[in-house]
Amino acid sequence: DGKKQGEKDAASAYADVAADPGEKPTIIVVMSESYADLSVVGDFSTNIDVAPYFHSLKENAIHGYALSSVFGAKTPNSEWEFMTGNSMAFLPSGSVVYQQYISKTPTSIVSNLKNDGYTCVAMHPYYETGWSRNAVYPDLGFDETHFIDDFDQTKLLREYITDRELYEKIIDRYESRAANEDLFIMSISMQNHGGYTEKYDNFDEKVRLLGLNYPDVNQYLSLVHESDSALEYLISYFQNVEDPVEIVFFGDHQPSLSSSFYPNLNGKGLSGLTEDELEDLYTIPFFIWTNYESTEVELPITSINYLSTLALERAGIELPAYNQFLADMMETIPAINSRGYYSKSAGGFLHIEEATGEEADWIRNYNILQYNNMFDKKEKSEVFFPYLK
């Protein structure tokens, strides 16, 4: 029947993504604060390459660009989309999920991996009360949480703990794992947090725009450059370990910079934009790298809510029912966020209410499933949303 054929088509398309490491890999996620590639908005020139190492990583990774649902702020919404596979598309504008909608143990990559025997660790080198994470992380099912007091607070760039210090902590936790411990680490960095207007004695800014004078943009790009060096340190370490390791890296949202900078990129600024131009501001780079699989897969457009499904597939882990639904949905709806979705039939971005035909069917079913997962306490589908064991 048609559904079975649809599943076969989806399975064949994602054969490139799936890999079999032979044993359960360590899975490390880095959601990098304000990490973005501003060239998606428009062209500009700098004195040096902003992220040379990131650009070199593509050869043995799934890589590309993903839609975020937020611009310049509200990090936890990206965190939530990644972990749960849910989308801000179906929640009221301006929502912050962690402060409004988290229930006890929602189905997520945390509960799925925990049910699969993983130890689940959350790391965030900032205050535990930020966005109520100290309450939310235990609800999500994390076994361990590490906040600012667990990090070396002398390792600062400007006034935030460095990516390098976060990565050293990740490596320490990996090296101290028990003999048969399967490890999942979800980390959220702080180094590149806005704003970018103050000058700091502890930060030698290496990147500068050519032909344009925007000190905040220079500082931001210099921070991304520092992130790039730290990333090389992290990947170089895990390239040389024998056990299988997967690293998922993505930005949570683009930075908030001088509004007068944007006309230099897109010719218009931040207003009067087409839907496609607006979505450029919600686009962040990502990769999923492993030390056991060398195939390169380029995904020119996806969205943060799909990344955990891609990560589970690449890790060789059998997809839970909800993630299988998302893997199938990607074939028709390659990207979706709070603004709209990428329509293959239209060849561009549309608002959700503009969807027709098969695209509308997928979006409607996704909305129904997400509502069931988040709000339907009595009739929650245990097929799609098994409880934490």
Regions inferred by a protein language model and the residue ranges of each:
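N-terminal hydrophobic targeting segments that direct proteins to the cell envelope
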Residues: 1-15
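Solvent-exposed soluble domains appended to multi-pass membrane proteins
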Residues: 12-24, 29-32, 37-389
